[in-house]
């Protein structure tokens, strides 16, 4: 699951993003390819967790409760990221978008189990997830993202580039804060 997700984001989605303005048709083909990879990872993740917790699909629909433990944390994280990849690569497909609450639920569950896991990776992922929430105004969005950013930096001792890059892409770029965007990128380069 992890390898597929990393390949989907790190190679295929990156290629699609670079192509979108030059060759829209090829970019869309890449997004479809990434979506297939993420869908396979998502299905694998659901299958893995469902074998241990037969009510897992009901849990995703808030129809059951499950007491997850530390052994589940990696599967929870990579499932959340694979669902996020399905949503991202679908380019707004409503049949994928309806799964967005599941991403948040999985990420919050991971934080509850072990907030410091993999240098605060759940908090870094929450930065991206939070920016997708349409129910937050700009002040609430920034407050929430700042909270998750601070936690991610805390748990990584400031040594993980991920939160800085995610913050720059999720906040500074859409709000056209060029100086802050460049400052974050320069900070990462000099880490």
Residue map of PLM features:
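Short coil/linker segments at helix-helix boundaries
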Residues: 2-109, 121-151, 167-173, 177-191
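Residue-level recognition of tetratricopeptide repeat
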Residues: 72, 117-119, 158-160
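Long amphipathic all-alpha helical oligomerization modules
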Residues: 157-165, 169-170
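Solenoid-like repeat scaffolds
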Residues: 112-113, 150-157
């Amino acid at each position: 699951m992890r390898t597929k997700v990393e390949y989907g984001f790190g190679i295929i989605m990156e290629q699609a993003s670079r192509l979108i303005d030059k060759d829209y048709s090829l970019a869309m083909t890449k997004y479809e390819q990434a979506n297939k990879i993420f869908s396979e990872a998502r299905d694998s993740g659901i299958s893995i967790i469902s074998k241990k917790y037969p009510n897992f699909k009901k849990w995703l629909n808030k129809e059951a409760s499950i007491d997850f433990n530390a052994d589940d944390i990696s599967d929870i994280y990579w499932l959340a990221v694979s669902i996020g990849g399905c949503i991202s690569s679908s380019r707004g497909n409503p049949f994928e978008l309806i799964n967005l609450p599941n991403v948040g639920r999985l990420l919050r569950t991971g934080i509850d189990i072990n907030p410091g896991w993999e240098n605060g990776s759940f908090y870094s992922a929450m930065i991206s997830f939070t920016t997708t929430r349409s129910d937050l105004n700009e002040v609430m969005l920034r407050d929430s993202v700042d909270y998750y950013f601070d936690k991610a930096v805390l748990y990584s001792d400031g040594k993980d580039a991920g939160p800085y890059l995610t913050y720059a892409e999720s906040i500074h770029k859409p709000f056209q804060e060029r100086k802050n965007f460049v400052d974050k990128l320069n900070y990462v380069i000099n880490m």
